[in-house]
Amino acid sequence: MNGIRDVVREEQPRERLLLEGAGSLSNRELLAVLLRTGSKEETVLKLSDKILHQFDGLRMLKDATLEELISIHGIGISKASQLMAAFELGRRMVRLEYQNRYSIRSPEDCAKYMMEEMRFLQQEHFVCLYLNTKNQVLHRQTIFIGSLNTSIVHPREVFKEAFRRAAASIICLHNHPSGDPTPSREDIEVTKRLVECGQIIGIEVLDHIIIGDHKFVSLKEKGHI
């Protein structure tokens, strides 16, 4: 009996999932369940290992394109589609938890709301959350993608959506692809410019959160707002 269970453990991840639960599986085993089969040359677990190695683990894999996936020997359109669909479902499930008028009472609340969506992005994304008078999220919008500087982040684009949504206040966020959320001089200058504009037009910029890899910095807590 122990021998059979050892085979299940090592070579049949789907059966192990049924016996022990999905939480007991490693990343390679979960990936193998999604792939279902290997190729003529290698088992499904070997194929899983190859994929994880190619993308340096889950961090890069979650944003893999169709072209990148099918470039791997043993991955065709069908397997690539299964993986991409699974990753998108995961992203949507994370969003579902917070989409019903999520209330932001602290920098921690804001970071929790956006962390999983932003921490793996490979380019800087500047995002604004538009809040009502109860600090509930009315809308969020990506203002631009690219390196942050004062010439790119124009207050007009930030506050235009605030007027459209009748927002009482704004929280700005952007990610550092390096994983280190330490603010740069440009980050601070952009923040001060937006705060000044908000004071003039009567829409408060509550904070600017920089997202790293499971870390964040609040420029309000740092004294820059």
Curated annotation (Swiss-Prot):
Per the record, the domain of life is Bacteria
Q: Where does Zn(2+) bind?
A: H174, H176, D187
One GO MF term attached to the UniProt entry: metallopeptidase activity
Q: Which CDD domains match?
A: MPN_DUF2466
Q: Where is this motif: JAMM motif?
A: 174-187
One matching Pfam family is UPF0758_N
One BP annotation, GO: proteolysis
Every MPN domain range: 103-225
What Gene3D superfamilies has UniProt attached to this entry? Cytidine Deaminase, domain 2
Q: Give the InterPro entries listed for this entry.
A: MPN, RadC_JAB, RuvA_2-like, UPF0758, UPF0758_CS, UPF0758_N
The alphabetized UniProt keywords are: Hydrolase, Metal-binding, Metalloprotease, Protease, Zinc
Which family is it part of?
Answer: Belongs to the UPF0758 family.
UniProt cross-references to NCBIfam families, sorted A to Z: PRK00024.1, radc
User: Which PANTHER family does its entry note?
Assistant: DNA REPAIR PROTEIN RADC, UPF0758 PROTEIN YEES-RELATED
- Specify the protein name: UPF0758 protein BCG9842_B0662
